[in-house]
């Protein structure tokens, strides 16, 4: 508990304190700048030359389909597929022939299946049946093939028993073989067993795979070099955007004005970069980074520091969405309110109106109001002692987890759709958005409920499930992990069924879910970013790849 007083906060109120650590970065990203592109026109020329070479490799006609499948997959895994979206789509459409696999070996079939399903093509898992023996069992001891099989199984949907068998078979085999494997296959397998490619942050997966591919004797030199140069060029761009975000953060001086809250602007950028890293979305990342920076300040105010009376005043001010409302909230909250309105005004002026889609700002504001309402309900749970049912808790937490909001804001920021119906559809929390939000909630609660209980919280998915169904803590946690797998299968299914209206939601839903999987894989990597999160941010945003 804390009795610290901020602004006009009441002196006689005992306040909680989550004891979040200060930023691990200090002013590093405020001043850091890559010199990779400085006075180096030759790098830009080489990049363009290599890009054309890789494009030629991709589009050249060949009867060697296994090699073309492998090349397409490597281009994507190396993180350079965004340069060749049209060419890759054309190749995948050619490969989407249900009879092709009859001529493929095990390894090629597994890669082909994952590649096509991963891009929304419907492929039956029955293609795996011909690789079973007369006893109906998978049988292969080849580590590379097992790795590809294991990766493919994570595209499964509900009811695909053959893929359930395959994941158990391949995982058991790979765990036994791992100590005997050498680089680079050992790292490929270790990475997959920890977080499979389909669930990994694509930029982080590329950073891991670039040195692995570079060590393969069969690598294509031009592709390997192109991936390294492209990574470093993109890193320089991201550093520039993060530097601007850090400057904005420092100007508002959030850390000193709100010392109880998480100071995580770099971690927020890592989150948004994981969701969409491509250069053409720089403006969108700028806006979303500010949103993901300020949203936890609000969350921590409701969850940790504010009284029920104070947060209720803030909720009312957000509902009014008027600068004049700042006079009706405690002084310490005013910097959040001012920053919040400024973010959305900037978003409207520089991104939304510039595209002639001014109606989007109403969706953006409404979804932000919605998450504040959900924080209000959670504050009421704590301050009144109310314990919601499991379903009631989950219904509210789908919103408070933030993924519906971030998916809709990312849709607006990307601006890749023309139909207003897409925003209307996403706003109803369809299965795709719901699955992403539920995965986020289960993962979050599993990693944070004990820490929250230490500061007085009693409401979480784990505790609500225990209370309602009369099970132990261990059983409830096991159920949450099972639900994560169920919702992943549902998310996979909905992405395969996407139509004109919902197709724009696929990438935001998948990528935000991937970020959560990675950010919380070893604990709450956002709140406590001193360990693996710091290392991952450094790998993506600090350290260039040696060429």
From Swiss-Prot:
A motif (DDXXD motif) lies at residues 299-303. Induction: Up-regulated by methyl jasmonate. Binds 3 Mg(2+) ions per subunit. Mg(2+) 2 binds at residues 299, 303. Pfam families: Terpene_synth, Terpene_synth_C. Keywords: Magnesium, Metal-binding. Changing residue 241 to E: Restore guaiene synthase activity. Restore guaiene synthase activity. No effect. No effect. No effect. Mg(2+) 3 binds at residue 444. The Asp-Asp-Xaa-Xaa-Asp/Glu (DDXXD/E) motif is important for the catalytic activity, presumably through binding to Mg(2+). Site-directed mutagenesis and 3-D homology modeling suggest that the structure of the N-terminal domain is important in facilitating proper folding of the protein to form a catalytically active enzyme. Belongs to the terpene synthase family. This is Inactive delta-guaiene synthase. The lineage of its organism: Eukaryota, Viridiplantae, Streptophyta, Embryophyta, Tracheophyta. The gene is C1.
């Amino acid at each position: 508990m804390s009795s610290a007083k901020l602004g006009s906060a009441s002196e006689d109120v005992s306040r909680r304190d989550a004891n979040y650590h200060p930023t691990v970065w200090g002013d590093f990203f405020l001043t850091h700048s890559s010199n990779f592109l400085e006075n180096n026109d030759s790098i830009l020329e080489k990049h363009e030359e290599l890009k054309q070479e890789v494009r030629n490799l991709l589009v050249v006609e060949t009867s060697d389909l296994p090699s073309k499948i492998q090349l397409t997959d490597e281009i994507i895994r190396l993180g350079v597929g965004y340069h060749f979206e049209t060419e890759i789509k054309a190749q995948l459409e050619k490969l989407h022939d249900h009879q092709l696999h009859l001529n493929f070996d095990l390894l090629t079939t597994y890669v082909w299946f994952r590649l096509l399903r991963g891009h929304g093509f419907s492929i039956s898992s029955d293609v795996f049946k011909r690789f079973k023996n007369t006893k109906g069992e998978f049988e292969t001891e080849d580590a590379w093939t097992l790795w590809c099989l294991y990766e493919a199984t994570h595209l499964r949907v509900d009811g695909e028993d053959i893929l359930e068998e395959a994941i158990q078979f391949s995982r058991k085999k790979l765990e036994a073989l791992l100590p005997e494997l050498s680089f680079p296959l050992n790292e490929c397998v270790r990475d997959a067993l920890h977080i499979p490619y389909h669930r990994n942050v694509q930029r982080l997966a590329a950073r891991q795979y670039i040195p692995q591919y570079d060590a393969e004797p069969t690598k294509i030199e031009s592709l390997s070099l192109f991936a390294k140069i492209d990574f470093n060029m993109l890193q320089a761009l991201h550093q520039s955007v993060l530097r601007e975000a850090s400057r904005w953060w420092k100007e508002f001086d959030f850390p000193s004005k709100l010392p109880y809250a998480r100071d995580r602007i770099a971690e927020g950028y890592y989150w948004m970069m994981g969701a969409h890293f491509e250069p053409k979305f720089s403006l969108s990342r700028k806006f979303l980074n500010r949103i993901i920076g300020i949203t936890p300040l609000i969350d921590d105010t409701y969850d940790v520091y504010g009284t029920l009376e104070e947060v209720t005043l803030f909720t009312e001010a957000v509902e009014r969405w008027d600068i004049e409302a700042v006079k009706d909230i405690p002084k310490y909250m005013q910097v959040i309110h001012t920053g919040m309105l400024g973010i959305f005004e900037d978003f409207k002026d520089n991104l939304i109106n510039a595209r002639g889609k001014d109606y989007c700002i109403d969706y953006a504001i409404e979804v932000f109001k919605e998450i504040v309402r959900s924080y209000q309900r959670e504050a009421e749970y704590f301050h009144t002692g109310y314990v919601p049912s499991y379903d009631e808790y989950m219904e509210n937490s789908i919103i408070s987890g933030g993924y519906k909001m971030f998916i809709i804001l990312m849709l607006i920021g990307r601006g890749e759709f023309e139909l207003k119906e897409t925003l209307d559809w996403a706003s109803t929390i369809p299965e795709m958005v719901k699955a992403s939000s539920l995965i986020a909630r289960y993962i979050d609660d599993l990693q944070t409920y004990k820490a929250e209980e230490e500061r007085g919280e009693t409401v979480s998915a784990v505790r609500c499930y225990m209370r309602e169904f009369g099970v132990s803590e261990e059983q409830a946690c096991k159920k949450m992990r099972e639900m994560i797998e169920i919702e992943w299968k549902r998310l996979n299914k909905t992405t395969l069924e996407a139509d004109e209206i919902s197709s724009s939601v696929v990438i935001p839903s998948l990528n935000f879910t991937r970020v959560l999987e990675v950010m919380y894989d070893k604990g709450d990597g956002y709140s406590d970013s001193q360990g693996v999160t710091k290392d991952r941010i450094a790998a993506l945003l600090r350290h260039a790849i040696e060429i």
